[in-house]
Amino acid sequence: MLEPNADHRAAVAQAAGVAASRITLTVMLDEWAGADARRRAVADTVCALATGCASLAAAIAEGPLAGDLARTLSSGEAGEGQKALDVISNDIVIGALKAAPVAAVASEENDAPVLLDPTAPLLVAIDPLDGSSNIDTDISVGTIFAVFPRPEGADASEPSAFLQNGRDMLAAGYVIYGPHTAMMLTLGAGTWHFALDRAGLFRLVDAEVKVKEGAAEFAINMSNYHHWDVPVRDYVDDCLAGKKGPRERDFNMRWVASMVADAHRIFQRGGIYLYPGDGRKGYTHGRLRLLYEAFPVAFLMEQASGSATDGRGAILDLSATGLHQRVPFIFGSRDEVARVSRYHLEPNGHGERSPLFARRGLFI
């Protein structure tokens, strides 16, 4: 094996020094929380999640050396195959939250809330491993979470405790496990970007994340084109028409089948993500979960000057009606999200059903 030369060693040392000089997540949270009891509880919960996600990053990095992490063990709550790594991820994050002031956890991997400390002030809704269909292909996966207050007098073991409005969230974020492990976090005053260092600490990359406008990228699963409602088709058709179409510019399409990966790209480059409801059985109201997928990503987007909608209004204006409720979900650059909303809301003869909700309409 070739020995690194002096220039290489110097570059590595410099990079390590730059990383070490960056403020840590723990310090940021301590400064934010101060002496406020609720903020302290939120900070402790986010720190616990960060610790769990750092452990999960190490487990994911083992890949096939740790066995067949992509093997299907059972059918989860959603009726989808529950992978071995789904179960491992769930155990890790819930285990980490046992040290936090959390009353209960609503996880994609559990039918009912997992009770931790019934008297604690907070609730956590979480997707421990978003994009698990990508495990065996070594494509980025992630963890998505939302922190809510426990309503006064609420039984945290009951799903009803979690059925809150999106504006009730106290914090939200995701961790993406890719070429490097990164976290996006909001506490309601902007969106912060952190990266995990080799010592297992999340260090600040950007405290003022902003979603760019004017990007010419959209993310949608084009294989479902013939199932979409007319407004969704029209939006995509206009993008695909390129410079000769009404948009007068060329667009690129992206689709990772891991919402965290698509969201992270949008935070870096702008653009839009669409997962509408469609005409297939089980897809009428979309596929993504409101509590632990749409709510937290929408919170992050809005705090970074982006936008998120179900096609009729802001995602964060919704109130959850079920622990695993599904919702059509569009998010990204504010200008593009507004355009898609106009395609659905303006009376221009687009289709016969309610926005994004397949042929039956939302309330039928």
From Swiss-Prot:
Q: What is its EC number?
A: 3.1.3.11
UniProt-annotated binding residues for substrate: D130, G131, S132, S133, N221, Y273, L274, Y275
Record's subcellular location: Cytoplasm
A molecular function annotated in GO for this UniProt entry is: fructose 1,6-bisphosphate 1-phosphatase activity
User: Known catalysed reaction(s)?
Assistant: beta-D-fructose 1,6-bisphosphate + H2O = beta-D-fructose 6-phosphate + phosphate
Class in the EC hierarchy, top level:
hydrolase
PROSITE patterns in UniProt: FBPASE (PS00124)
| Keyword terms, alphabetized | Carbohydrate metabolism, Cytoplasm, Hydrolase, Magnesium, Metal-binding
Membership in a protein family: Belongs to the FBPase class 1 family.
| The name this protein goes by in its record | Fructose-1,6-bisphosphatase class 1
Query: Taxonomic classification, please?
Result: Bacteria, Pseudomonadati, Pseudomonadota, Alphaproteobacteria, Hyphomicrobiales
